[in-house]
Amino acid sequence: MQLEIYNLIAEENRISISLEAICDSYSSLLWDIEFYQCGCFEVYIAASPQNVSIFQRGRIVTRSDDAQHFGIIESLQLETDAEKGDYLTVTGRFLACLLERRIIYPTITANGSYEDIVRKVLSHNVISAGIRNLPGFSMGTVSGDCWQKTARMQVSYDNILEWLYGLCETIGGSANVRLDGNALKCDLFSGTDRSLLQDDNPHIVFSDAYNNLLSFSYAADDAVQKNFAYVLGCGEGNAKKRTTFCSGAEPTYLDRYEVYVDERNTAQEEDVTDAEYLEILKSSGAEHLVQPKTASESAIAAFSTQYQYNKDYFVGDYVTMEQKRFGLIQPRIQLIGMVESFDQNGRSLTPTFKEME
């Protein structure tokens, strides 16, 4: 597998991409794809004068076998050692990190599908925002039912990258920015259910019984969860706007974990009715709910004859995890991250999972 390094030049309304080098002599590569945050990469390579001139901050790094993820070099570290040799560590994140350079300004009140809300935020701050534009940036493809659900919300001054991935985690979708010729395309999508709880798609089961689960650890903690929100908005005293929010049936007794959400700075604009304003408060309440904390670490077979990563399953998909020896099964668990590692020992896969309720 080769790495391709491109020079990126930003002009007023477009970008220009030119191939600078092709590299296959790196010592190691980490390629970390995440579903609810911006992914990242690391290249560890001998620090020759040629490599130092090739790997420059702001340039694009991509893999010859991945047409969806493009990294931008953000950090370089050069280390010289008379005995061990000279090495260059190149790190960065995928192109969605460009959205971190903008905030949502001014206040945006939006009502419609989540797709429409994202389009409005990006249009006002990234696409049709004058000198605030990201050159060549536009919306790409949209897929997944979660993006067609509707909401009303008010948002201001949030960092766009943090806001977007926070929204993604709330609704169960994701976003990715990719190169399309000399353009930047922002795709919105969702994962596919491949667990044992459905029959529309082939099942993906990682299990010690199938020899495709090399190691597995799991921990759960209820202490951090919040499942019922009291949301207070604008106004004073008895006139203060207030509502509550929970997901599904209202929790009771020992199953109820409450949180207070202060939205006094969320103004009710003249064209917003009381009912619409309460929906805005409910959206904020949804963002402050916290699921029980779970953590799992595992290693899965990189060269399994049963399932191939990025062919049979992808980051964001729902799969089944089973540890038969201890009688532990997670029938529907989401793959929210995958670190692919390439080094002298070959290729390895380290997944991150999020348990579903």
Predicted regions, residues:
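Envelope-exposed proteins and targeting segments
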Residues: 39, 69, 86-88, 182-186, ...
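An acidic/polar, Gly/Ser/Thr-rich interaction patch typically located in mid-to-C-terminal regions
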Residues: 24-51, 174, 208-357
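Polar/acidic, low-complexity leader/linker segments enriched in S/T/G and N/D
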Residues: 1-24, 196
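Surface-exposed cap/loop segments at beta↔alpha junctions
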Residues: 48-139
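Amphipathic, non-transmembrane alpha-helical segments in extracytoplasmic/periplasmic proteins
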Residues: 34-36, 43, 92, 107-138, ...
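Short beta-strand-centered interaction patches in the first periplasmic/extracellular domains
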Residues: 77-99, 137-225
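Short conserved beta-strand and strand-loop elements enriched in small hydrophobics
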Residues: 3-5, 57-66, 316-324
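Solvent-exposed coil/turn segments that connect beta secondary-structure elements
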Residues: 76-78, 93-97, 191-193, 234-236, ...
